[in-house]
Amino acid sequence: MKITLHQANQGDCLLLTARDGTTLLVDGGMKGSYRKHVARSIGTMARTGTQIDLVCVSHIDRDHINGILQLMDDLAAWRVFDYQRGSGNTIFPCPKGIRPPAVRAIWHNAFKDQVAEESGGRPSDSGGSRRG
């Protein structure tokens, strides 16, 4: 397994690549560090046709989630661009951000699940861990 630690200022951002090529992006750091460091690195994945199999958000603190939110914004902007160009709109502007790779799935540590676990309450229906 290959582990790539991205500069994320106060937060975290790791890219895990398994031997079989499966990729997992854990957190995204701050928005600025995502744009400056992470987007460039994962942009090479898009150029080679490699996708991110799973994006994992450990929790919703801004130093972990803001980079992922920027990734989602970039993905949406490029999808709109591709649609417009594919529909013959040749004057539609190219997005400013680096094209990110496709993302197959997203997982997040939901607040509802955390509260249920910490309070000893019933686990949520959203797939959180369950106590026996």
Residue ranges and their predicted role:
Residues 1, 66, 70-132:
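Flexible, acidic/histidine-containing loops and adjacent segments that form or flank the divalent-metal
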Residues 1-54:
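Conserved beta-strand hairpin/beta-sheet module of binuclear metal-dependent hydrolase folds
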Residues 26, 38, 55-57, 80, ...:
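Extended aliphatic helical segments
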